[in-house]
Design a protein with these regions (language model features):
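Active-site-proximal catalytic alpha-helix in oxidoreductases
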Residues: 31, 77-90, 112-115, 132-135
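Conserved phosphate/anionic-ligand binding catalytic regions in large, soluble enzymes, centered on
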Residues: 19-37, 79-83
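Functionally critical mobile loop/hinge segments
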Residues: 1-2, 92-197
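Alpha-helical support elements that line or immediately flank enzyme active sites
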Residues: 32-48, 89-97
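Helix-loop-helix junctions within the multi-pass membrane cores of secondary transporters/permeases
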Residues: 50-68, 72-73, 79-96, 100-103
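Acidic-glycine-rich active-site phosphate/pyrophosphate-binding loop
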Residues: 1-17, 50-69, 108-116
Length: 197
């Protein structure tokens, strides 16, 4: 709950125009909030040292950038959910003491969970999506730490984390093309209709 509150409050403030700095990740401030703050919130509930915390945040940035490299900078898929969410769950799993297999399981869990979350532009409502991503990051990590992972027989999950992320990129580039056009059409129609009121 604290991860969700911290992350969504920061996004709400940022999208509301608060004049406060935010560290970006993969070129996005909201990605930065999602990649860092859930890990920061979790640290208060576990034993850890500063170096492990910093490595967890570093891992989150690396995974965020790696997923983003596959999904693309502009996509119909919400990068905060899938890219930064994957980074956050990897960082949380690492911080809590998870091994490589558990980090991979957590990434698969969150990508299966949030793969279909769309991006419909940067706005105040992003706080809700970041809330969801932060909660899902914690949940995916906890599931994996307890041996509960989505199998490669399910949906877009591949036989490796790399393949799962490649599948996510394929979904983003090839599967969501029409969704992207439809989202843009709806947003443009809203702008046109706003002037007619």
């Amino acid at each position: 709950t604290s991860a969700r509150r911290l992350t969504s409050a920061a996004a709400d403030a940022r999208m509301g125009g608060a004049k406060l700095p935010a560290m970006s990740s993969a070129g996005s401030g909201n990605h930065g909030l999602t990649a860092i703050l859930p890990i920061w919130a979790i640290k208060d509930f576990i034993d850890h040292d500063r170096d492990t915390l910093l490595r967890a945040i570093g891992l989150s940035h690396i995974i965020t950038a790696y997923v983003k490299a596959h999904t693309g900078r502009l996509s119909a898929v919400c990068g905060c959910s899938v890219a930064a969410g994957a980074g956050a769950t990897a960082g949380i799993t690492y911080l809590v003491g998870g091994d490589v297999r558990q980090v991979e399981g957590a990434i698969g869990n969150i990508l299966e969970d949030l793969a279909g979350v769309i991006c419909d532009g940067a706005k105040a409502g992003c706080a809700i999506k970041l809330n969801t991503a932060a909660g899902a990051a914690v949940q995916a990590a906890l599931f994996s730490l307890h041996g509960v992972n989505v199998k490669d027989t399910d949906g877009i999950i591949g036989n490796s984390t790399r393949k799962t992320i490649q599948n996510m990129g394929d979904l983003s580039h090839n599967g969501m093309g029409q969704a992207d056009k439809t989202i843009l059409k709806i947003m443009l129609e809203k702008q046109l209709n706003k002037g007619k009121r």
